[in-house]
Amino acid sequence: MPTHLSKTRKHRGHVSAGHGRVGKHRKHPGGRGLAGGQHHHRTNMDKYHPGYFGKVGMRYFHKQGNHFWKPVLNLEKLWSLIPAEKREAYLSSTNPDVIPVIDLLPLGYSKVLGKGRIPKVPLVVRARWFSKEAERKITEAGGVVELVA
């Protein structure tokens, strides 16, 4: 049957309330904080936090990050890099002498991928890498692909 008494109330009148005579429910029997993860709390760590301790894999000495820096941009996002008012002017322009030049390195991209469509408007795109598909679509639109270091 449910009772209105909490469990602590049941211990009243029994001196140490279930916490012993010597220790008296003091101090830190399991250590402080996260102590003992590799020792007396190991079963808990192994069960609930597998892989918390230890290392995996190999280290890469003298790694030069710029060899692996290759942020990509799809063709469908290429025109969004041009400010809106200039974009409208380029797309509606009939003057073939004025074409946009998009240099991707200062914008934080190094490779152009071929996903998506671009309008049949010539443009110059400068980047370190181009996929074959991206290069094909840009040149078909009348544009130029420029590789930069």
From Swiss-Prot:
This protein's record includes keyword Ribonucleoprotein: yes
Stretches for region Disordered: 1-42
UniProt xrefs under PROSITE patterns: RIBOSOMAL_L15
Pfam families in the record: Ribosomal_L27A
InterPro entries noted in UniProt: Ribosomal_uL15, Ribosomal_uL15/eL18, Ribosomal_uL15/eL18_sf, Ribosomal_uL15_CS
UniProt biased composition (Basic residues): 1-14, 21-30
GO molecular function term, any single one: RNA binding
Domain of life: Eukaryota
The family this protein is said to belong to: Belongs to the universal ribosomal protein uL15 family.
Name of the protein in its database record: Large ribosomal subunit protein uL15
Species name: Blumeria hordei (Barley powdery mildew)
